[in-house]
Amino acid sequence: MAELVLKTDFPDLKLAGRGKVRDIYDLGDALLIVTTDRISAFDVIMNEAIPDKGYVLTQISSFWFRQMEDIIPNHIISTDVKDFPAECQKYAAQLEGRSMLVKKAKPLPVECIVRGYISGSGWKDYKATGAICGITLPAGLVESDKLEEPIFTPSTKAELGEHDENISFDKCVELIGRELAEKIRDVTIAIYKRARDIADTKGIIIADTKFEYGIYNGELIIIDECMTPDSSRFWPKDSYKPGGAQPSFDKQFLRDYLETLDWGKTAPAPPLPEEIVRKTGEKYMEALVRLTGKGK
């Protein structure tokens, strides 16, 4: 099995920050994003590494970014370590397969969530109010139902350890202006529809997903990750049955385990049994194999 990477430490490179999963290095006119094997749930980072998770996320993101280039440009300069600047080469073994050299964009202060099915926080909102992010939905929907049309439900971008807050489209307009808000809404739904159709041919339902965008040289581009098991709900099509939660190829498996514990969903995280770690890794790898036809 490949070496597990919980955290990178590259003394010759300038660390710009660590997110829940990614370590980001500032290379001057570009960023180096290294996707570790960390996993978070309920905005808390677990103590254990998930085997090959960083590899899976990077490969799935690359796959989707390529599929969407005619809809919107993305931030990737290269995912081939040989193309990275000279100062990165001594770390090639750790970077291989889990890193991206990317453009330095100015991130927009909203996360762009699109939902094709009703699940997760959307289902909770609907049960309480009959709506999600101010969008009224038909009465009588059940958990995991397919929506007639995908809906755009943005959220704020919280600081590490805080929770994102769902916001209305009008609030999104307040934050970034109407023209940009309409553009990211339309692009988000267009990407989702194409991905949904591609995934459908591979036996996967993409129930919902989230994107981040930035401005680079005055142009809107998609940044961060693209439809990975961290940012999306992937369900097996062959066992889809509305009326309850669905089995999944994402971290829902981990969330479901954590829900059985007497844990307050705040740091420190509880220890994870070896079987949960292994099975979570297998679910991530299965998503990669199903989508791209290639494992590791």
From Swiss-Prot:
Catalytic activity of the protein: 5-amino-1-(5-phospho-D-ribosyl)imidazole-4-carboxylate + L-aspartate + ATP = (2S)-2-[5-amino-1-(5-phospho-beta-D-ribosyl)imidazole-4-carboxamido]succinate + ADP + phosphate + 2 H(+)
Taxonomy, superkingdom: Bacteria
Enzyme class: ligase
Disulfide bonds, paired cysteine numbers: none
InterPro entries found in the cross-reference section: SAICAR_synt/ADE2_N, SAICAR_synth, SAICAR_synthetase_CS
Pathway terms, separated by semicolons: Purine metabolism; IMP biosynthesis via de novo pathway; 5-amino-1-(5-phospho-D-ribosyl)imidazole-4-carboxamide from 5-amino-1-(5-phospho-D-ribosyl)imidazole-4-carboxylate: step 1/2
Keywords (A to Z) from UniProt: ATP-binding, Ligase, Nucleotide-binding, Purine biosynthesis
PROSITE patterns named in the record: SAICAR_SYNTHETASE_1
One Gene Ontology MF term: ATP binding
E.C. designation(s): 6.3.2.6
HAMAP family (UniProt xref): SAICAR_synth
Family of the protein in this entry: Belongs to the SAICAR synthetase family.
Name assigned to this protein: Phosphoribosylaminoimidazole-succinocarboxamide synthase
Organism: Geobacter sulfurreducens (strain ATCC 51573 / DSM 12127 / PCA)
Gene name for this UniProt entry: purC
